[in-house]
């Protein structure tokens, strides 16, 4: 298949070997670049754009970069050249007028304030970027920052010498990572148990240790006020070196309904992949193996989940409730933004609790202040859903209809003991999640 290279917002400049795209007549293709791009997933080798992204809103830019990631082949690059907000502000502070303004006949500029407002608002500018902001929105939608480049320079010959605007002070090359596992890969998976209640801990631990995928780290971060968890664990540590135990400081134990314990599990995990396991839940023996196999099926998978079977205190099956019913009749790849919008519109977490999901640790490393946050706000009550939404913005999900986890309902669950408080926190969290995704243009 011939390589496809796109030149977005080409204006009157056409590149040989590229599909030159603009809204104006004369381009190879006339397209509205704020709408979905008409290329199949993983079909494009590279994308170039100079002095276009600042002419659309932040939300439209996020969607455009999401589309670029979708259509790029793994390893493909999108190169964005745009004015540098940091330089614009420095010019204002230093009372410097760039020669480019004079070249275009703007010798009448009177003062730095006038020049700054021109940079922000003239020529249809809607949103200017510095390196931090442009890098952030690229990572948000699943692209990796490959390099910040100087004008005309690139490690890829096809992008060299392309810039023609002296004010292209910010040039970033993003790369689409290769997320697909090879069939014979055996990555290290951390099964992370944020332990607190010892009642069902032994059963949870045994379900982790009995996994058919054996390249495991079983990490226990212990929030239990006493020594019950450690005592149970000592029996297993003697015979299984995959177990790693961390006792949380007494001053943080149980804090924020266990949220801090989840985040310690995340930080301490050594595996490429993380599989949370609540101390009262269970995993099917083939859970990790089946979920890893799903990562071999497509390029853009960031999250694998499955149906979870509700059980009672004795391990007996309970009937499904709305959120635990399988949303599909057979195993399915579900596009991330579509799934996220469905969840936020319906108000139902069909992906599941932390026990339900397998994901790469690195995918959430850029979320601040931590992966259970959204829009900079640490969340409780829907903290797991915050993680899933970040992952869905970066790629697609796979839902497996086989029940690979067992979600235990009992009277001592946090949701039961602190029901009213958890409900209020969840309601606040849903509002934060919905507002963020709407503001970023990730849902209508």
Q: Which residues does each predicted region cover?
A:
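Conserved SAM-binding loop
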Residues: 3-90, 172-177
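S-adenosyl-L-methionine-dependent methyltransferase catalytic module, highlighting the catalytic core
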Residues: 60-63, 67, 73, 77-179
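Glycine-rich, basic loop-to-helix element that forms the pyrophosphate-binding segment
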Residues: 204, 249-269
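Acidic donor-binding segment of Leloir-type glycosyltransferases
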Residues: 206-252
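Conserved donor NDP-sugar-binding/catalytic core segment of glycosyltransferases
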Residues: 286-325
């Amino acid at each position: 298949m011939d390589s496809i290279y796109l030149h977005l917002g080409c204006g009157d400049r056409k590149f040989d070997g590229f599909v030159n795209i603009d809204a104006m007549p004369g381009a190879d293709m006339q397209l509205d670049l704020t709408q979905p791009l008409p290329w199949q997933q993983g079909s494009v080798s590279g994308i170039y754009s100079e002095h276009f992204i600042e002419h659309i809103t932040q939300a439209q830019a996020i969607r455009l970069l999401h589309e670029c990631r979708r259509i790029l082949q793994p390893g493909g690059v999108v190169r964005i050249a745009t004015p540098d907000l940091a330089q614009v502000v420095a010019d204002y502070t230093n009372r410097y007028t760039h020669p480019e303004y004079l070249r275009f006949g703007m010798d009448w500029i009177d003062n730095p304030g006038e020049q700054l407002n021109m940079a922000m608002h003239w020529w249809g500018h809607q949103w200017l970027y510095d390196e931090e902001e442009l890098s952030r929105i690229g990572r948000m939608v699943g692209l990796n920052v490959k390099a910040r480049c100087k004008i005309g320079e690139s490690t890829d010959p096809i992008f060299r010498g392309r810039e023609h605007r002296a004010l292209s002070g910010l040039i970033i090359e993003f790369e689409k990572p290769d997320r697909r596992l090879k069939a014979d890969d055996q990555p290290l998976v951390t099964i992370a148990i944020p332990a607190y209640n010892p009642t069902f801990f032994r059963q949870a631990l045994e379900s982790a240790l009995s996994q058919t995928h054996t390249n495991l780290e079983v990490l226990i971060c212990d929030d239990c006020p006493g020594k019950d968890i450690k005592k149970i664990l000592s029996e297993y540590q003697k015979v299984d070196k995959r177990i790693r135990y961390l006792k949380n400081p007494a001053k943080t134990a149980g804090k924020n309904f266990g949220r801090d314990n989840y985040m310690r599990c995340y930080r301490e995990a050594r595996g490429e992949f993380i599989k949370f396991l609540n101390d009262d839940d269970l995993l099917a023996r083939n859970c990790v193996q089946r979920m890893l196999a799903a990562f071999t099926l497509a390029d853009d998978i960031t999250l694998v989940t499955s149906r979870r079977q509700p059980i009672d205190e004795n391990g007996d099956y309970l009937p499904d409730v709305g959120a635990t019913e399988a949303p599909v009749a057979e195993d399915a790849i579900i596009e991330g933004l579509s799934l996220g919008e469905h969840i936020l519109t319906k108000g139902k977490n069909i992906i599941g609790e932390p026990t339900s999901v397998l994901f790469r640790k690195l995918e959430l490393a850029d979320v601040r202040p931590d992966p259970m946050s959204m829009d900079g706000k640490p969340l409780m009550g829907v903290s797991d859903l915050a993680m899933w939404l970040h992952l869905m913005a970066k790629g697609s999900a796979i839902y497996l209809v086989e029940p690979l986890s067992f979600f235990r309902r009992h009277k001592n669950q946090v949701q039961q003991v602190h029901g009213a408080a958890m409900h209020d926190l969840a309601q606040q969290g849903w509002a934060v999640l919905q507002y963020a995704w709407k503001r970023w243009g990730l849902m209508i």
